[in-house]
Regions:
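Enrichment for repetitive, rod-forming helical segments
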Residues: 10-11, 132, 183, 307
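Primary recognition of N-terminal secretory signal peptides and signal-anchoring hydrophobic helices
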Residues: 19-135, 145, 153, 157, ...
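Sterically constrained small-residue positions within well-ordered secondary structures
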Residues: 13, 110-112, 199, 271
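Bacterial N-terminal signal peptides
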Residues: 7-16
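A broad, structure-centric signal for solvent-exposed, well-ordered loop/edge residues
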Residues: 8, 38, 61, 70, ...
Length: 339
């Protein structure tokens, strides 16, 4: 063989070997986790049959086979597609590497250093729309005072705050992000409380939603009509993910609550927001324990403080959010097995 063609042949063999190990599952390209781990300096361990752990000097990632539920530095994050496994090892959807893992590991590549001055708070429901109802408790009656408390704390820190409603009035869903857009808000935060189906009063904990990536199904797909196309909010998708991550992390840590995770949805109040936007479900009114807390003003004040801390943590992003120097702890990314 001509020596000058040998490097080209070796490159081709290496590329073909990598391509052969890739997989196409349910319409998605999956990458061998071992290849991605090696390229990013991770060591792989299999502590259980359906769980794979990736570690390096600063980070720890755990993926569960057939699970889309991830845990990142102690915070649950729902992936768009489940991790998989073949005879060569674990596989991860390239889509999730691009839209979740990479942004969360390297936020400085996705968030420019822009000063946040104006925040739009959206107290969920109002007027004829009472939201969730548990006994004589209506969701709309708790989202508004929570918004007032968050507003007051933010204003003390020098932020300008916009409310989509300040009384018990009905505001159409599309109008809410329109208010934020017209007033030049830097962030949009919609405030809600959750309710579980009958017989599931054990469910508790906050959830934080951001816009679903284009082409993926939502964690909560109700009312989306199968439209997976781009929205205005998708222009800010990575920033919204990072805001949601910091918010969920702050809520769980500061409230000592069960972590229901960062999730994706095309909620009407998120779709048209022309800035990073999230929707917070602050807890479950149907939980006998958590419900009583939600109805208590002192707990809502504590929750408001956690929300403010989440916003401040997002604002401070200037390097890897999972840097030990920044967090004082090692990175954890975890995907649990179903059940």
């Amino acid at each position: 063989m001509n020596r000058k063609f040998l490097p080209l042949v070796l490159v081709c063999l290496a590329f073909c070997a990598g391509a052969a190990r890739a997989a196409f599952i349910n319409g998605q390209n999956y990458a061998p986790l071992a290849d991605w781990a090696g390229a990013n300096g991770f060591r792989i361990i299999w502590p259980a049959h359906n769980e794979v752990v990736l570690t390096n000097r600063t980070s720890r990632l755990v993926f569960g086979v057939d699970s889309a539920q991830a845990e990142i530095n102690g915070v649950n994050v729902r992936l768009s597609f489940p991790a998989a496994k073949d005879r060569t090892g674990a596989l991860i959807a390239q889509f999730d590497l691009d839209t979740a893992i990479r942004p969360l590991l390297s936020p400085s590549h996705y968030v420019e250093q822009k000063k946040i001055t104006t925040i739009c708070l959206d107290p969920g429901h109002g007027g004829k729309d009472s939201g969730n109802r548990v006994g004589f408790h209506y969701e709309k009656n708790y989202t508004l005072p929570l918004a007032f408390e968050v507003r007051d704390q933010l204003k003390k820190l020098g932020f300008k705050v916009i409310l989509t409603r300040s009384t018990d009035t009905f505001v159409d869903l599309p109008v809410r992000p329109a208010i934020a857009n017209s007033r030049g808000a830097d962030l949009f935060v919609s405030l809600h409380f959750n309710a579980a189906q009958s017989g599931r009063d054990e469910v508790s904990g906050p959830e934080t939603y951001c816009i679903t990536p284009v082409g993926a199904s939502s964690s909560n797909a109700q009312g989306e009509g199968g439209d997976y196309g781009p929205t205005t909010a998708n222009r800010f998708g990575n920033k919204s993910l990072l805001l949601a991550y910091q918010m969920e992390k702050s809520l769980v840590q500061n409230l000592g609550a069960e972590d229901r995770g960062v999730r994706r949805a095309r909620f009407a109040v998120l779709r048209d927001a022309a800035m990073p936007a999230i929707l917070i479900e602050g807890g479950y009114m149907t939980s006998p324990v958590e419900g009583k807390k939600i109805y208590d003003a002192s707990y809502r004040k504590q929750m408001a403080s956690a929300i403010v801390k989440g916003i401040l943590n997002y604002q401070r992003l200037s390097g890897p959010v999972l840097s030990p120097a920044a967090t004082g702890m090692s990175t954890v990314i975890k995907v649990k097995t179903p059940g």
